[in-house]
Amino acid sequence: MAVFEGSFVNASQFRLAVVIGRFNDLVCEKLLAGCQDCLKRHGVDPDPQGTQVDYAWVPGSFEIPLVARQLALTGRYDAIICLGAVIRGQTPHFDYVASEVAKGVAATSLQTGIPIAFGVLTVDNLQQALERAGIKSNLGWNYALSALEMASLMHQIRSTTGEVPRQTLPLAAAPSNFAGT
């Protein structure tokens, strides 16, 4: 029997995408800084002008799953990191957004076979968000580390089983000009 476990030895070989929500940008920019620090320390060049990491900025967390899915369907990425912050307010809006973002990111990963790190903070107040984005620790680092480990793990499994990631559009038909690459 085989034992599969991700490592960080060959992280410099990975191609990654990071999707970041602009809403609550004070928090999201700190998460991004932690993410980039982790990538750099593991041999990945996080420079937006480089060839290893692409960045997609979206209006808010609710838009993250759609863009993550579109990026995953290109087949260019070993993993995708999603960063955002949903902070509870006085209305049920928080519950809807937090739930749908989590479901959308999970569904995208399962449907495409591409590891997607869920780095969307869901917190009760700004103080909690800031604590998780740098005051006490920066979870952006953890989300990047998770993506690297999962990319490595999926490469191990695929190299052993011969499976390739799906590059189909499971929820809707592909547009006629979609090349799938």
Curated annotation (Swiss-Prot):
* UniProt-annotated catalytic positions: H93
Q: Does the keyword Transferase apply?
A: yes
Its GO biological process terms?
A: riboflavin biosynthetic process
- Pathway linked to the protein: Cofactor biosynthesis; riboflavin biosynthesis; riboflavin from 2-hydroxy-3-oxobutyl phosphate and 5-amino-6-(D-ribitylamino)uracil: step 1/2
EC numbers for this chain: 2.5.1.78
Q: Name residues in a coiled coil.
A: none
* GO cellular component term of the entry, any: riboflavin synthase complex
GO terms, molecular function: 6,7-dimethyl-8-ribityllumazine synthase activity
UniProt keywords (A-Z) are: Riboflavin biosynthesis, Transferase
InterPro entries this protein is in? LS, LS/RS, LS/RS_sf
Signal peptide boundaries: none
Q: Which reaction does it catalyse?
A: (2S)-2-hydroxy-3-oxobutyl phosphate + 5-amino-6-(D-ribitylamino)uracil = 6,7-dimethyl-8-(1-D-ribityl)lumazine + phosphate + 2 H2O + H(+)
Give the binding site residues for (2S)-2-hydroxy-3-oxobutyl phosphate.
Answer: Q90, T91, R132
Residues holding 5-amino-6-(D-ribitylamino)uracil: F23, S61, F62, E63, A85, V86, I87, F118
Q: What's this protein's function?
A: Catalyzes the formation of 6,7-dimethyl-8-ribityllumazine by condensation of 5-amino-6-(D-ribitylamino)uracil with 3,4-dihydroxy-2-butanone 4-phosphate. This is the penultimate step in the biosynthesis of riboflavin.
> Hey, which family's this protein in?
Belongs to the DMRL synthase family.
- What is this protein's record name? 6,7-dimethyl-8-ribityllumazine synthase
Origin species: Synechococcus elongatus (strain ATCC 33912 / PCC 7942 / FACHB-805)
At the highest ranks, the source species' classification is: Bacteria, Bacillati, Cyanobacteriota, Cyanophyceae, Synechococcales
